[in-house]
UniProtKB/Swiss-Prot annotation:
Name of the protein described by the UniProt record: Dermonecrotic toxin LarSicTox-alphaIB2c
Cellular component GO terms held in the UniProt record: extracellular region
Organism listed in the record: Loxosceles arizonica
Active site: 5, 41
Main location: secreted
Organism taxonomic ancestry: Eukaryota, Metazoa, Ecdysozoa, Arthropoda, Chelicerata
Annotated function: Dermonecrotic toxins cleave the phosphodiester linkage between the phosphate and headgroup of certain phospholipids (sphingolipid and lysolipid substrates), forming an alcohol (often choline) and a cyclic phosphate. This toxin acts on sphingomyelin (SM). It may also act on ceramide phosphoethanolamine (CPE), lysophosphatidylcholine (LPC) and lysophosphatidylethanolamine (LPE), but not on lysophosphatidylserine (LPS), and lysophosphatidylglycerol (LPG). It acts by transphosphatidylation, releasing exclusively cyclic phosphate products as second products.
EC class of the enzyme, as a word: lyase
Domain of life of the native organism: Eukaryota
Length: 276
């Protein structure tokens, strides 16, 4: 999965997919009442990027639905996965359940079209704080209460805080999550990747490949350089988040990688660990 980073303006959906992304990451900011408000990152953000592009969240969802609904004039067949980077650090821990509830209501209405031929992309809810695990509970229970528990088949999870992998597993146990887990690892592109290294990403890959691990997929962020892309592919990640999808696409076409990797399509299950 080539994951376009910080796609917060509607026009950027086309831009990133045209550059080679089959997945996008969208920042979601919340108001004081835990309601998703804007697709907005804010300052600071990655180097060589504008941090302040934004849309109203529900407007973005409607555009995203069009981009992922077969037959629509704005449809992109290859856009199959959307990561919502949920900026919940502005919220108190007790608001996490409410944030999940309101997020589910917004997605149900504006993205899934109340279960009637809505957008088809798989969705990953990425939470920065392990203490906010109840967001998952609120999201899941709301879909169930609204009569659409089946939509959870399209939803996966990520804790993005680079916490110890054992601690992440405990948070999932508290939330009752037993699958559909993506594990992110990484650092802003402003800091050279060799300073952080790939040790934690390697641990995540090892967990994914073990018989009793909780992780289904591993992605690494934010990768803009050819050398770092190769390093991430060499340890066996499933996804790379990038500001330059064309860089990742070019590396995937190199002889060392094109036999081993290919771009994921809608038919590839994002909740299943890939077995060679």
């Amino acid at each position: 999965w080539i994951m376009g980073h910080m796609v917060n303006a509607i026009y950027q959906i086309d831009e990133f997919v045209d550059l080679g992304a089959n997945s996008i990451e969208v920042d979601v900011s919340f108001d004081d009442n835990a309601k998703p408000e804007y697709t907005y990152h804010g300052i600071p953000c990655d180097c060589r990027r504008w941090c302040t592009k934004w849309e109203y969240f529900n407007d973005f969802l409607k555009a995203l639905r069009k981009a992922t609904t077969p037959g629509d004039s704005k449809y992109h067949e290859k856009l199959v996965l959307v990561v919502f980077d949920l900026k919940t650090n502005s919220l108190y821990n007790y608001q996490a359940y409410d944030a999940g509830k309101k997020l589910a209501e917004n997605l149900l209405q504006h993205y899934w079209n109340n279960g009637n031929n809505g957008g088809r992309a798989y969705i990953v809810l990425s939470i920065p704080n392990l203490a906010h695990y109840q967001l998952i509970t609120g999201f899941k229970e709301t879909l169930k209460n609204k009569g659409h528990p089946e939509l959870m088949d399209k939803v996966g999870h990520d804790f993005s805080g680079n916490d110890n992998i054992d601690q992440v597993e405990k948070a999932y146990k508290k939330a009752g999550v037993t699958g559909h887990v993506w594990q992110s690892d990484g650092i802003t592109n402003c800091i050279a990747s060799f300073i952080r290294g790939l040790d934690r990403a390697k641990k995540a890959v090892k967990n994914r490949d073990s018989s009793n691990g909780y992780i289904n997929k591993v992605y690494y962020w934010t990768v803009d350089k050819y050398a770092t892309t190769r390093e991430a592919l060499d340890i066996g990640v499933d996804g790379i988040m990038t500001n330059y999808p064309d860089v990742i696409a070019n590396v995937l076409n190199e002889s060392a990688y094109k036999e081993k990797f290919r771009l994921a399509t809608y038919d590839d299950n994002p909740w299943e660990a890939f077995k060679n």
